[in-house]
């Protein structure tokens, strides 16, 4: 990340190992007659602890996905920059019986496994969140048309429906999904409402088909 203020350039970067974070401040201290900078002062400081705290604040403690707090922040950021995105909401089907039958520990392990699969459904430029007990959200960078949205929903559904083997127990769940696109379907608030409505419409259809 690069920022500038009062002729000071701030660069945040991490080592290739991914576990050492630094902030580099570059300050011009001498200029030539042509106005070009001839001498710089570079100051580097460790910001690893700050990055770690920010990561913890934005991460769901159970699944390792981003949390609802960061979800709202990401959508706000997209809207402030007027960058298009596609939002997918998904709610697990048949999750409650897993908790009732095998206990909450098994339910937690299932949520972790679902989160792991969802990571494979998105690109590096996208985001995956846990926003409720068994509710998740995916934010895809860029707008997608209806055909692509339905393809993505089918991919999510097939990924989640594959049986899970947890502690020797085979568990099968499904996913009810809804989607909306910013700015095609309105502002970020309207997009969230529409995606939520479509998700619950999908859940009603899934219940009716049982």
What are these regions (language model features)?
Residues 19, 24-40, 48, 187:
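Short loop/turn elements at sensory-signaling interfaces that couple input to output
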Residues 34-63:
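Sensory coupling linkers of modular signal transduction proteins
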Residues 54-73, 90-104, 112:
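Conserved nucleotide-binding and Mg2+-coordinating catalytic segments in signaling enzymes
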Residues 54-55, 68-84, 115-123:
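Short regulatory alpha-helical coupling segments
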Residues 95, 114, 128, 136, ...:
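Hydrophobic framework residues that shape the active-site pocket
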């Amino acid at each position: 990340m690069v920022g500038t203020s009062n002729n000071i350039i701030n660069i945040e970067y991490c080592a290739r190992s991914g576990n050492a974070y630094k902030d580099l401040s570059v300050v011009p201290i001498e200029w030539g007659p042509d106005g070009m900078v001839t001498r710089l002062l570079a100051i580097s400081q460790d910001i690893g602890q700050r990055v770690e705290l920010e990561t913890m604040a934005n991460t769901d403690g159970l699944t390792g996905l981003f949390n609802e707090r960061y979800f709202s922040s990401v959508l706000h950021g997209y809207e402030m920059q007027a960058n298009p995105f596609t939002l997918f909401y998904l709610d697990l089907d048949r999750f409650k019986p897993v908790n009732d039958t095998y206990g909450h520990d098994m339910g937690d392990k299932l949520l972790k496994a679902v989160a792991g699969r969802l990571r494979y459904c998105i690109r590096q430029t996208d985001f995956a969140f846990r926003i409720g007990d068994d509710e998740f959200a995916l934010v895809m960078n860029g707008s997608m048309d209806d055909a692509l949205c339905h393809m993505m929903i089918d991919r999510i559904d097939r990924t989640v429906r594959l049986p899970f083997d947890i502690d020797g127990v085979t568990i099968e769940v499904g996913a009810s999904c809804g989607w909306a696109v910013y700015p095609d379907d309105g502002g970020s608030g309207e997009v969230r409402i529409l995606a939520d409505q479509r998700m619950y419409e999908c859940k009603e259809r899934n219940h009716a088909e049982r």
